[in-house]
């Protein structure tokens, strides 16, 4: 049985980690490190110990794994004191780039722990499972990269695409985090739809960096906010090398993902729906081929807080410790 810590338990991702780990059959103790945990009444349980971050230095050596649910730069600040747990899974972008210079360019933060980067594995199980099995440290992917890479992977793996991929990505407002901003307040998000960080979103370099490990493709990425709380819908348009039908694509995607518990591949005429992945660790995908332009249209829906964050992190934990990947994650959507 595991003793698990969550640093930054009061944000949306930290709360999701807490909710899911609380019902995980292999988690015995759950330590929540937060300086302002206002939701303690929600999580009354003998499993849970709520404390402030200052006690981390006293407890971290006794924990089997620690989840860092902090903002960019904050995990670095936390770990740079030398208090590095035996295993950690980081939800921020602090360890997603192997090149510290690339991280500094994208996030404007100096990386002060380059010696750790070589030991960190990018935690997208459907692509890097074998590396995750022996990993000590995991960088959990961003939500947009998770959906985008799962959509592109079968084509890249089979060398079926080239050139430029257009990724048109829409996210619920929870992706912006719990701290309110002008864009996230109800009056601005309700009955509204807007793009943001056009052509300079920080997840674009992350997507491109991972693609370099498995193939080659340039990316044009435009994210948008939609008036829902949780959920992500990504539409990908990418050229095809050969004459391929929608049925061909369907069979290719099914073959690549046939053993993946959390990937659902739909027939060509179907579209994923945000509502049908809400509250799950699923990624639902459909792919179609347009014979006029020789482009593929790939559609992906995930819950940005679960498969795009907390659920995927727990999936990584399961792999790390040799548990079944679906352990503690086998729930159905919040539907209707």
From Swiss-Prot:
Described function: Catalyzes the NADPH-dependent reduction of N-acetyl-5-glutamyl phosphate to yield N-acetyl-L-glutamate 5-semialdehyde.
Annotated EC: 1.2.1.38
UniProt subcellular location: Cytoplasm
Reactions accelerated catalytically: N-acetyl-L-glutamate 5-semialdehyde + phosphate + NADP(+) = N-acetyl-L-glutamyl 5-phosphate + NADPH + H(+)
Any one annotated GO CC term: cytoplasm
Signal peptide: none
Gene Ontology MF: a single term: N-acetyl-gamma-glutamyl-phosphate reductase activity
InterPro entries xrefs: AGPR_AS, AGPR_type-1, NAD(P)-bd_dom_sf, NAGSA_dehydrogenase, Semialdehyde_DH_NAD-bd
Active site: 143
Organism of derivation: Dictyoglomus turgidum (strain DSM 6724 / Z-1310)
Record keyword Iron present: no
Matching Gene3D superfamilies: Dihydrodipicolinate Reductase, domain 2, NAD(P)-binding Rossmann-like Domain
Keywords of the record: Amino-acid biosynthesis, Arginine biosynthesis, Cytoplasm, NADP, Oxidoreductase
PANTHER family associated with the record: N-ACETYL-GAMMA-GLUTAMYL-PHOSPHATE REDUCTASE, CHLOROPLASTIC-RELATED, N-ACETYL-GAMMA-GLUTAMYL-PHOSPHATE REDUCTASE, CHLOROPLASTIC-RELATED-RELATED
Biological process per Gene Ontology, one example term: L-arginine biosynthetic process
Organism domain of life: Bacteria
Classification via SMART domains: Semialdhyde_dh (SM00859)
Pathway annotation from the record: Amino-acid biosynthesis; L-arginine biosynthesis; N(2)-acetyl-L-ornithine from L-glutamate: step 3/4
Protein's name according to its UniProt entry: N-acetyl-gamma-glutamyl-phosphate reductase
Recorded family membership: Belongs to the NAGSA dehydrogenase family. Type 1 subfamily.
CDD domains: AGPR_1_C (cd23934), AGPR_1_N (cd17895)
